[in-house]
Amino acid sequence: MRAWLGVALVCMVVAGCGDASPSATPRLGAGGGGGASIDLPCDCALGEECSDDGRCISICGDVAACASGGTARCCAAGTVCQDGSCVTDCGGNAECNGVCCDNTEMCLEGSCVAQCADPGQLCGDDNELCCASGEACVGGGCAPLRGECTFGEDCEIDELCERSLGVCIPREAVEVCEFQPPTGDFDPTIGCRWTPLEAPMDATAEEIEIAAMSEVVMTPSVANLTDDNGDGVTNALDTPDVVFVSFNYAADGCCTKRGVVRVVSGGCNGDGTMTTHATLKGLASGDWIGNSTGIALGNLHPDDMSSERVPEIVATFKNGGTIAWRRTADDGTAWEVMWQNDTLPTNAHTRGGAQPSIADLNADGRPEVIIGNVVLDGLTGKGPGDVDLPAEALAWDGRDLEVMTPGANLGIGNNAFLGPVSTVADLDRDGLQEVIAGNTVYNYDGSKRWTYEYTTTNSRCGGSLDCDGYNAVGNFDDDDEGEVVIIRLGELFILNHDGLPVTGIPLPIRIPGAPGDVAEPTYSPAAYIPSEPLYDEDGDLLPPERILCGGALQLPAYDSAGNPTTSEGSQVVVSTAGANESGPPTVADFDGDGFAEIGTASSTAYVVFDFQCTGDPLPAGCDQEHEWVRWMVANDDCSSRVTGSSVFDFEGDGSAEVVYADETSFRIFRGSDGAVLYEDTTHSSNTRVEMPIVVDVDNDGKSEVVIPEPNTQADRGGIEIWEDSHNNWVRTRRIWNQHAYSVTNVTEDGQIPRVPEPNWTHSRLNNFRQNVQPGGLFDAPDFVVREIFRLDCDESQYTMAVVVGNDGSLSVPPGILTHVVVTTADSEVFDLGAVPTSDWLLPGQSEQFEVVFEIPDGLEVAGLVLSATVDDDGMGGQQYNECDDENNARTSNPLTCPLVQ
């Protein structure tokens, strides 16, 4: 019976092994209680003891002991055992060094930090943030990662390029280094000028002719065409190039003459000259380029040919036809004819001054070349009549449609005697672009979308081809579609994308002339002698208050009450100078009011039309004599009467400036009121359809003005690069690829988008012939000297290293000067000159360069002190305005040489 009870006791103890209570851990101990005795040893874990009834129990009573190593202890009230130590009892939260973390925190390396599955995503001064996927810790906060970038221009206006990550982030995520230039201190100066090199002694007759072609009377184009830094790619790290046509005014005269294409580096040489890479003409000896043709730059290859990225050059010939060149040497010194079309355009399309464009009309990745209402295949140059036109190519001639539709009177894009100046846009936003040529909008395939029939005129047409108008595109109402802008025979037209008038804007608006002297008018009947002022049908004074130039215009006369003035039973007709066709329109927010205006240059005035300038009375700031006119300033352009203009906000103050050159001067007007901010009266031109352009032509992060000039004075003419003498002009894009430039029509590296973003829908655009005001308008570099140390030395020389960096927000090109000075222990000073950087300094980057100090004979050198100042030419001159120019200098500790005792 005792034996059975003993077995029963053992079974009970074993059964108790399922009890997890720390005070009743059922371990086998010494048997007892009578009956047969079974000796069970008590083998307890650290922190336990053997109870009287043979069980292992905690030494701390109701709670487990805290054991670590070979010792165990009991934790005090309010604490718990964690990893062998008694720590504060934080319930379900993490404990860190005696502190309870919040329920949103975890313990990392002894500190409470945000709960984060990836500790690498922790952020904030105290790691209180955990950045989500698609975010990064920047500037102490989590910033969303957006598009990839190399430069700030790759990002949206409210973003900047975080170079360490290579992505765009919101600008507010970091403290941005900025320099905001003072306004009102407008001081342009010529940075450099291009003129051709003299012909070599062994030059051919043609080479001698070409060397004498120094005048320019067309609109230059700018893009990166050369690999200047030798890295094997042509991109935004290289210096842009200027492409233009030059001719010989003295030998050939002014108009529609023979010329050659020049490819010139946009960088200014130290002596104020510019470097010519190449000179181009057609395949045959007589294939001269028209001296007033435009230049279009862009990649003509299909966009799936990833190995072909360098833009090509497109121009038109003097006597019809089109040509394209492609680069065959990385440095731009060699080009070959990619294709030559000797047929289109013909003299039915142009009599001089054709302005080609490049676009992908049908969004197939294969660009087209557009001249007026002619479309050529961009890859081959083939036209609609070529039997070997590739099946996948698009080509057409709007004149063919007119021939098939007698009386259609379809537009080409001419005004006065120059053109065509057409453009391309996706007006209805269906993903396919239209060709806008004068008064006709063509579908991508050459079919007619619509034609506006003119019923009025304000000028005679000075050319032998019909004047159907120059074009631009913008948005002047509340819808999302684009409106067509036409300047034609002294009148402005704005039409909806469907060809109907825009609500609230009349058709047409007359372009007024400017006050000034004019030849005596004649009257019909001839017996009429005026005794009171005469007016036209719109109530404008007739001569001499209204002047035009370039031929006769017959204007019926009215009195001040609007009644016809009669003589001998007939209404009096006043004959006066009458050609005032006016130049290609520029669309921009001239006055900073948030609405787009239109500028154009007539024969006698530059006029800005503002569609808020209406009502009775007219709003303040408007021209009080002419409804719809913001301002007008007299000019001098009776030769072509169709010069162009561009607009840019040089100071970034929200008020744009107008850049314009006529026969006798180059001027910059304030956009809000036409005040002349700068005038260069040494400028001279016979004028065609040319205009100055604004572009970062040398990739220095600042804008410049590129001005063509056919000035025949010995020290003038060619191409002039104007810049601000104080380096205050804000930055812009490095590209202006064609006359009909609208920013979104081309990427900064010269690629032609399949479906470009409609310019007028972009928050900072809605412009035409105006370069972009980029995000980070005031971004600036912050140059620092990071380190100075000795590399090597002996009795004859010291070799020292200087590390300079850019802690700012603006990338800067090579050539930043650092002035270096050595001072000996006895205070003798040696100027080692200014050392240029050899590569780009992007934000956060550094460059190390070496300087060698040759120790003069007899000089005791116990230790040298080297001082370095970055962005210093040694004479106090700086290349850049910085956000902090007080941290540019550094002085080393005495640099000793172990080899010199």
Regions found by a protein language model. Give the residues of each.
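Extracytoplasmic/lumenal domain signature
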Residues: G147, G152, R163-A780
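Extracellular/luminal regions of secreted and cell-surface proteins that mediate adhesion/ECM remodeling
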Residues: G775-Q901
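Disulfide-braced loops of extracellular cysteine-rich modules
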Residues: I38-E49, A65-A77, G92-N103, D118-G134, ...
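Bacterial N-terminal signal peptides that target proteins for export
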Residues: M1-V7
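Fold-core signature of tandem repeat domains
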Residues: C50, C56, C81, C86, ...
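Ser/Thr-rich, Pro/Gly/Ala-heavy low-complexity intrinsically disordered linkers and tails
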Residues: L9-C56, G61-D62, S68, C81-C86, ...
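Low-complexity, Pro/Thr/Ser/Gly/Ala-rich linker/spacer regions in secreted
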Residues: S37-D39, C90-G91, V113-D118, L145-R146, ...
